[in-house]
């Protein structure tokens, strides 16, 4: 599906570089962002993966989309805080309350092997028991949750603007700039976005597609720009940049034709860590790193057929493949090899957990082109013997290292003195062979004489043992709905009806009756 970005036609009065309206519009954007920044947007505690979701018939697309939202760190923490449901006036039909119940039940009150059935409130307005586009359902769900937030905000603050935690988490701002090629006057317009659609028809990677999005478009001929300063239509250039980056970056790879629904099934590489700074309208300061936490995948030939699943990164840092009711471990290598449809990135600055945070040294390694050169220089420096003075080394480098150097000759003297004292103490002055003495002297010097003071920006990373790649499940056909669930739960707890209690009493005599044949419990979130 191709998403068209439309921008308001530029006001000719704004073509002058010093037009005051331009700065006022930008100030409003910054002010709104500042107001929205009051929400806590990070994992407050490490969470494991959520439970699987029941396929009610061609519902794999909404299951995959809901799993990606459930494992969005800022959104999950907002849902777990119960902030909205405590003030909502109509929770029985509120989509945000339904999403809050789904996330809470999935992350906090489920066990391994449990299966949940998404609430009818979340799915009824969109799902018609046929295959749909997962990205369209994502945008529909975000907008309906945004409207639910606005209803509460307008009741408490009638004068509040159209801002919500949903836009605070996923919302960013485009800056569309038109520049007159004669007088160099510019006109800027700002528009909010919740996702970034990318044309991948000629791109080999997400980074290349991002660069293609920002290519300058020439406005000439019938499409020429009316310059307010020149007072006539003039050739101009139009550029599109991210002006304010979102906290959660949702990148959509346009794989489906808007007319036929046919899929562009080509490999497009995407990184685990992405620096958005080069794509900003004003790229100042340090890197703006994002970490991948979810990948939504479509396996099929058209948007009306095939199967959807996703890979998500849980709060404790491990990756899982969420395929309807099946939840299986996977590694980041297999995740990066998927034929992705929608990518989810989160700003590193908004994550607190070490298991998710990328260490500063890792950020530099991925984002800074000069880091590899610096790293190789440090490796060469570490290979030098601490017993040999490097007289050709600059003084400032020796000062930085702050290593107390000892020559090989001094090492021999210390060795002989130490062994002589030891021999006198035990009544034996016999010295060890010279080869062994060299080794022991080196050990003593390393333990007592050599002091290594790492620089302030040095980082020590202990790599875990590599594990074997987890097997990847081949995409299956649509899963059939589960039947004969042994235990039905809602977001408020067990369903205490006479029939269920009677059935439960009959089953208690059998061992393990709290699970079905697949070892799964069906949880109903109402």
UniProtKB/Swiss-Prot annotation:
Polyubiquitinated; ubiquitination leads to its subsequent degradation. Its EC number is 3.4.19.12. GO terms for molecular function: cysteine-type deubiquitinase activity; lncRNA binding. Transmembrane segments: none annotated. It is an enzyme of class 3 (hydrolase). Residues 51-348 form the USP domain. It catalyses: Thiol-dependent hydrolysis of ester, thioester, amide, peptide and isopeptide bonds formed by the C-terminal Gly of ubiquitin (a 76-residue protein attached to proteins as an intracellular targeting signal). Residues 473-486 have a biased composition (Basic and acidic residues). Expressed in hematopoietic progenitor cell lines Ba/F3 and FDCP1. Not detected in brain, lung, liver, kidney, thymus, spleen and bone marrow. Signal peptide: none annotated. Residues 374-385 have a biased composition (Basic residues). Pfam families: UCH. GO terms for biological process: protein deubiquitination; proteolysis. The active site is at residues 60, 307. Residues 1-21, 374-394, 465-494 are annotated as: Disordered. Deubiquitinating enzyme that removes conjugated ubiquitin from specific proteins to regulate different cellular processes. Has deubiquitinating enzyme activity for DNAH5, suggesting a role in the regulation of DNAH5 degradation by the ubiquitin-proteasome pathway. Has growth-suppressing activity; induces arrest in G1 phase upon controlled expression. Belongs to the peptidase C19 family. This is Ubiquitin carboxyl-terminal hydrolase 17-like protein A. It comes from Mus musculus.
């Amino acid at each position: 599906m191709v998403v068209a970005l439309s921008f308001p036609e530029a006001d000719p009065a704004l073509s002058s570089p010093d037009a005051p309206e331009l700065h006022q519009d930008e100030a409003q954007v910054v002010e709104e962002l500042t107001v929205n920044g009051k929400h806590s947007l990070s994992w407050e505690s490490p969470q494991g993966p959520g439970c699987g979701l029941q396929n009610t018939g061609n519902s794999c697309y909404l299951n995959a989309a809901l799993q990606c939202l459930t494992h969005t760190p800022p959104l999950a923490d907002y849902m777990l805080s119960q902030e909205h449901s405590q003030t909502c006036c109509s929770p029985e039909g509120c989509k945000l309350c339904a999403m809050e119940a789904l996330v809470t039940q999935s992350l906090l009150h489920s066990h391994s092997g449990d299966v949940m059935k998404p609430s009818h409130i979340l799915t009824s307005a969109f799902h018609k028991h046929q295959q749909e586009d997962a990205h369209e359902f994502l945008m529909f769900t975000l907008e309906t949750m945004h409207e639910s937030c606005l209803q509460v905000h307008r009741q408490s603050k009638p004068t509040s603007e159209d801002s919500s935690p949903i836009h605070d988490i996923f919302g960013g701002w485009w800056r569309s700039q038109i520049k007159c090629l004669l007088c160099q006057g510019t006109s800027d317009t700002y528009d909010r976005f919740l996702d970034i659609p990318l044309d991948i028809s000629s791109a080999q990677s997400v980074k290349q597609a991002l660069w293609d999005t920002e290519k300058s478009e020439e406005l000439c001929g019938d499409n020429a720009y009316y310059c307010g300063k020149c007072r006539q239509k003039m050739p101009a250039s139009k550029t599109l940049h991210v002006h304010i980056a979102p906290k959660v970056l949702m990148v959509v790879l346009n794989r489906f034709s808007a007319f036929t629904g046919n899929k562009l099934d080509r490999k497009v590489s995407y990184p685990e860590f992405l620096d958005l700074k080069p794509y900003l309208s004003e790229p100042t300061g340090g890197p703006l790193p994002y970490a991948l936490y979810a990948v939504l995948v479509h396996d099929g030939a058209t948007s009306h057929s095939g199967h959807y699943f996703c890979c998500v990164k849980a709060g404790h840092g491990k990756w899982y493949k969420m395929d309807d009711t099946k939840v299986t471990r996977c590694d980041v290598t297999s995740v990066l090899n998927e034929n992705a449809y929608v990518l989810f990135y989160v700003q590193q600055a908004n994550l607190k957990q070490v298991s998710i945070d990328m260490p500063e040294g890792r950020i530099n390694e991925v984002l800074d082109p000069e880091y590899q050169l610096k790293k190789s220089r440090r490796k060469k420096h570490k290979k030098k013997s601490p017993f040999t003075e490097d007289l050709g080394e600059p003084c400032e480098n020796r000062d930085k290292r702050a290593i107390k150097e000892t020559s090989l000759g001094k090492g021999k003297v210390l060795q002989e003195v130490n062994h002589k004292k030891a021999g006198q103490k035990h009544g034996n002055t016999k010295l060890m062979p010279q080869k062994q003495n060299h080794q022991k002297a080196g050990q003593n010097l390393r333990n007592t004489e050599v002091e290594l003071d790492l620089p302030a920006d040095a980082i020590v990373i202990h790599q875990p043992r590599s594990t074997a790649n987890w097997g990847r499940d081949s995409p299956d056909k649509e899963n059939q709905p589960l039947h004969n669930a042994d235990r039905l739960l809602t977001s408020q707890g067990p369903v205490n009806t006479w029939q269920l209690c009677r059935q439960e009493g009959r089953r208690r005599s059998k061992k393990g009756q709290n699970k079905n044949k697949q070892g799964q419990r069906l949880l109903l979130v109402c």
